[in-house]
Amino acid sequence: MSRRCELTAKGPQVGHKVSHSNIKSKRRFLPNLCNVTLMSETLGQSVRLRVSTNALKSVDHNGGLDAFLLKANIANLSPKAADLKRQIEKKKLAAAS
């Protein structure tokens, strides 16, 4: 399982650990990932995703998973989230017509 957020594509970064004597050694900064179950109101089902805490705040700020996915760039989404976005768009289009 990769250490990458399924909604925002945040992944590990590389940097330095700096000691008191200013000696630098390589280290990895890992994203704060959580396994969460989010509810899709359009589809009427819950979806289990591995997302960063930053993405959780963004989902809440945008008004839910459906609104976040509709605004999100499909290139940043995981295949699972991209498929979910397509399903939501298809369902909204069918409801509109």
From Swiss-Prot:
UniProt record, GO biological process: translation
InterPro entries: Ribosomal_bL28, Ribosomal_bL28/bL31-like_sf, Ribosomal_bL28_bact-type, Ribosomal_bL28_sf
Keyword set includes Ribonucleoprotein: yes
UniProt keyword annotation of Plastid present: no
Keywords from the UniProt entry: Ribonucleoprotein, Ribosomal protein
GO cellular component labels: cytosolic large ribosomal subunit
Stretch list, region Disordered: 1-20
Protein family membership: Belongs to the bacterial ribosomal protein bL28 family.
Listed PANTHER family: 39S RIBOSOMAL PROTEIN L28, MITOCHONDRIAL, LARGE RIBOSOMAL SUBUNIT PROTEIN BL28M
Name of the protein this chain belongs to: Large ribosomal subunit protein bL28
Organism, scientific name: Afipia carboxidovorans (strain ATCC 49405 / DSM 1227 / KCTC 32145 / OM5) (Oligotropha carboxidovorans)
Gene label: rpmB
